[in-house]
Amino acid sequence: MQFIRNDKLYDTDTAKLIETEYKYFYQPKSYVDKETHHSLYKKSNGEFFLIKEEYERIQRGLYPISKPTIEPLTEEEAKKWAEDNLSTTKYINTFGPISE
């Protein structure tokens, strides 16, 4: 997938996928549940971006609710997302050593 934001190209085929967070939302009294996928990517120039996808989950599978969206992130925003979603090892491999 390719996106342009603020006159910059973001391409999921050339960027490195760091992690995808999956969330499932059960909807009582509904035949359709919801699932979200948030994927953190790092470009070769060090920029980060988050791809957000939403799906309806029914008995026969997942169906997109809308087009995927992109959110360019600063390194600090990417670190905050990573603190909540990455293992310690993956965090250090992505951002480098941290102090104790």
Give the positions of each predicted feature.
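Secondary-structure transition motif
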Residues: 1-100
